[in-house]
Regions:
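Generic structural signal for small/hydrophobic residues in well-ordered secondary structure
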Residues: 10, 17, 39, 56-57, ...
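PLP-dependent enzyme catalytic core of the Aspartate aminotransferase-like
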Residues: 58-64, 73-118
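Structural motif corresponding to alpha-helix initiation and N-cap regions
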Residues: 49-50
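Conserved core segment of the aminotransferase class I/II
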Residues: 1-11, 15-19, 99, 105, ...
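Conserved glycine-rich beta-strand-loop-beta hairpin in the small C-terminal domain of fold type I
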Residues: 7-18, 29-43
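A structural motif corresponding to the C-terminal end of an alpha-helix
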Residues: 20-25
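Short beta-strand-to-loop capping motifs
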Residues: 41-45, 86-88
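Short, solvent-exposed loop/turn elements at beta->coil junctions and helix N-caps
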Residues: 27-28, 68-73
Length: 118
């Protein structure tokens, strides 16, 4: 049925996102969670997600939602996190998206320092 096929497609897309995200770990990214339509990821940069989101849109044409839109103000994860929507792109575009994120070259922060603040 259409519903069953659509469900399978959605689940496969989420699985593909998680699998293709793995190489980003070496570049300092981490996958906080991945659902059927969105993923929450920690980025490796010194600047917060609110500052970086418009820069990434300008430089790479990638629209990311800053984590500060989804976390309480006092939560330190908000500035370190992006929400990525992948519901309307196919597996090839997911792969391209993640390769482009991996190659971003903004100033990176020291993850050890961040882990101590948590």
């Amino acid at each position: 049925s259409w519903t069953s096929d659509r469900r399978t497609e959605i689940l496969e897309r989420a699985k593909h996102f998680s699998k293709k995200f793995e190489p980003l770990s070496a570049a300092g990214w981490s996958l906080r969670g991945c659902g059927a339509y969105f993923a929450f990821v920690d980025h490796p940069f010194k600047e917060g997600s609110e500052t970086l989101a418009p820069l990434i849109l300008r430089d790479q044409g990638i629209l990311l939602m800053p984590g500060t839109m989804f976390y309480p103000k006092y939560d330190p994860h908000g500035p370190r996190t992006f929400r990525i929507a992948f519901a309307n792109i196919d597996k090839n575009k997911i792969t391209t998206l993640l390769e482009r994120l991996k190659n971003l070259s903004y100033q990176r922060f020291d993850r050890k320092e961040y882990n101590e603040v948590k």
